[in-house]
Amino acid sequence: MSVAIKMSTNTVGGQSTRQPPGSACLHCRNKKMKCDALQPRCKNCFNAGVECIRSNNYSRKRSAQRDHIEGPQDRVETSDAEVYDVQPKFNPGLFNLDFHMDSFYDMDYNFLENITPESFPILSPLDSLPSLIPSETVECSQPQTVIETAGILAPPLNDPINDLMHEDLDQLYLDRVHRLIPILHRRRYFSWTRSPNRTDAQTCLQFAMWTLATSLSTQLQHLRESFYQRTCSLLDKFTAQDTAAPQIEYAQACILIVNYDLMKENFRRGWTSAGRCIRVIQLMRLFEIDRSKGRNDREDWIQREEKRRAFWMAYSLDLFISLRGEWPLSLTGTDFVRLPALDKDFDNSHYVEMPFLGTVLSGASSSVLSPWAESIVFATIIRRITALTSELEGLSPGSSSTNVWSKIDLLRNILKSRLASLSFKHQDSHFPFSDDPMETFMIMIAQSSVLYLYNTQKSFSRATESSQNISMALQYEAQMAAQEIANLSTSILHMSRFKIHPFTPLILAKCMEFYKSNQNLDEITQAAVKQIYELLRHISKVNNIAVEYLS
């Protein structure tokens, strides 16, 4: 005889706390956890980062008698089969559930890796990009090697980003973008990023940051297109407004989108975005941020430093794009903008007064410069060298060459002084260098400046007897510089390709051009060219600038 046992039920406020029968999802049933039946995902599924599935066919009739369970083996097999059909490959060991809000800078991105397109409603495809992005009518002969997003459903633009996703995206940006584009003051950003009263410009910057961050992640490609569309929409909105002085966040968003367009779209689109960015910088008059007359001394140093960094990043983009396309510079007024401070001073809000670019080039400053500031100095020297090349092309056949060789010698002396300073700073360094991508890029661009100067004097055929020594010295120095770049390429191969400076392919292509035009210099030329070519292929997986140099 079976014994009937009356089950007791706990009540709170007159209502039963027992979970409604049949309401638990498959994940909670499988883990034997209490399910709160929230939509679209219960709390347990949200924390585990898995899809919350409820099966209408899965129901268990609970017997009123504890000692009366019919067919236990059959029921267990049925339950296992149903769970296996829904999630045949789920492995709990793949997910890290130990997320701590206090250790923000040590978090991982496992939660975002489990976001699927099915988590969002279906969107109708956009017919075209925002109006400021030009339509591409010219066929591109370069294959797109980046991960394609066609056919992947994007989240709706008004879909809220929860706190966990928000923090993961911010951390991804700091890990993979901020060190290469150090224009953002982190404390200032975190002071407003969660504010419900943030401005449209701040929202635009936020989405621009996430656009670039997701583009450098293999797991988040399905999010980047919607972020990109939202950013472009906000940028178009600001462009249509008649505002006298745009906010600094708007300029920062423009800078990030230029980098995105160059790396993930194509050179023409990046060039067009750069034009908009430069106009914003000029409209804000950032080229005179440190002009003594009329400067607002009450403005805090961090805000001025952010504006300086926005100017110098736009200047760097303008310079590298002009080198790539052999065009004149658009931003030329650098006399009233101090060079960016060291990153540690900037991040810690430590006031310092940096020298001007002209002071550094004249050798009248002994200030310690950041790797980014050093790269600005060497990039400016390269630009002066290319301007001298244009001057040589315009010389008449009968003109004197004395003045030209004096300019070449002057630039060579400036380079020797800057390179000697770098050699002293890195005298204890060995290959491979540290994983600081900006420092590695700075050393590469410093060496490439010697290659640019060598090409300039080589194109000038009217060498006098007094200039033979300069020519021979430059040839030897160019060989050494090319070898240094080849050595650095070995170091870069050991870095994450997501952390390589976007314009590294420009330097590698210049080195490869030097080797190919001087194949009789040494016996290791072919090996060096092959190594650089392999590095370009390595970078081309995430950077379309490298794709253009591979053809």
UniProtKB/Swiss-Prot annotation:
Keywords tagged on the record: DNA-binding, Metal-binding, Nucleus, Transcription, Transcription regulation, Zinc
Comp. bias (Polar residues): 7-20
Region: Disordered, residue numbers: 1-21
Superkingdom of source: Eukaryota
Keyword DNA-binding: yes
Pfam families found in the cross-reference section: Fungal_trans, Zn_clus
InterPro entries, alphabetized: TF_fung, Transcription_factor_dom_fun, Zn2-C6_fun-type_DNA-bd_sf, Zn2Cys6_DnaBD
Gene Ontology CC terms, in alphabetical order: nucleus
Subcellular localization(s) per the UniProt record: Nucleus
UniProt DNA-binding residue ranges: 25-52
Entry GO MF terms: DNA binding; DNA-binding transcription factor activity, RNA polymerase II-specific; zinc ion binding
Main location: nucleus
Alphabetical GO biological process terms: DNA-templated transcription
Known role: Transcription factor that regulates the expression of the gene cluster that mediates the biosynthesis tropolone class of fungal maleic anhydrides, including stipitaldehydic, stipitatonic and stipitatic acids.
Protein name: Tropolone cluster transcription factor tropK
Species: Talaromyces stipitatus (strain ATCC 10500 / CBS 375.48 / QM 6759 / NRRL 1006) (Penicillium stipitatum)
